[in-house]
Amino acid sequence: DRGERRADCARTALLIPDLLAYWLTGEARSELTNASTTGLVNATERDWDPEILHRLRDDFGVEHLFPPIIEPGEIVGEARVEGLELRTSTGEPTPVVAVGSHDTASAVAGVPAQTGSFAYISSGTWSLVGTELSAPVLSEEAWAANFTNELGVDGTVRFLANIMGMWVQQECLREWASLGDNASGAGGRVDWPLLDAQTEAAQPARYLLDMSSPELMAPGGMVERVRSLWIPGTGVSSSPSVDDESSSVDEAGVSIGDPKASGVDPRERATVLRAITDSLALAYRRAIRRTCELSGTRPEAIHLVGGGSKNRLLAQETADATGIPVIAGPVEATAIGNMVVSLRAIGVASGTLMDLRAISRASSALATYEPRASHARLWDQADALLDARL
């Protein structure tokens, strides 16, 4: 608050992970990966930027509030909580480790990559799409494209863009569930096998969405917004589809049930879900392509981690749309990245970041999706069509 200078009342500014570590140890430190998302860290020096802090001094008085930076993998201190005896199994004091406390930093540390030439998509409600570099990309072009240089484990840079994830799908399912649709979770559990089968059977690229549209950000009423925003895609044909109201079976022979059994027509549901999945794969294609252009890299594989990695159709279409193999999993990449960095910090594991990733690879069920050359033209056409409408 510029007028009241409330920062004058504070002694130290800590982000939430650092506050938790402070409560456990009494040591005030700022973990680097999370600090880098504040815009106050120099991405090259990997420390607070004195020029930026100086500029904030007169208006906000925050220059003195930030404690020293600590790299992920360093030990903050020993856990000391009044009234609790916190000891290891060998009776030693319990160390508190600064992991990649920004969740994407730990997720990228947990990517099961075999080489350093990879791109990643951390796919949850939102998607973080980018690559891992040894130095930041500080070009005007990268800034204009809304890419950021978030800092990572072991001196790395997470060069990435924050784009749409599973949010639109989640909102549609929530809406259908409120109308009593059991498949969408009205009974408390989403019937993913049924929804996945119906979505996969629906016509590809029948409708397309610009997943960066601000109109898709707000909660509520998502189904109607999707239908109002989509454009006819490249996959329209005269063959039967899930929109054909004369049949209870789609073109792949998957039963879609009775459209009158609830307030939700399964044919419409499948069409909407397919449009969302196709459009998200197209958004991933565009983000990966822009990542490569701006960073001068060409990944050998795309690692799809997080909840979106469970979506087989999305993984396959991302491979098809980008022309790059997609390795899906682990779902809990953030937890694994946290774990392996902690294990190395206390001496249970050792080696480089790639050695830690070998632990992730050996501990995870992964699925590889190769790009299908026969689908390349469809995605080129879809990309051009959407580009013409933007």
Kindly give the residue locations of the regions a language model identified.
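A conserved helix-loop-beta module that forms one wall/lid of the active-site cleft
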Residues: 57-74
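Short beta-strand-loop/turn "lid" adjacent to the catalytic site in phosphate-handling enzymes
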Residues: 1, 21-42, 70-71, 76-81
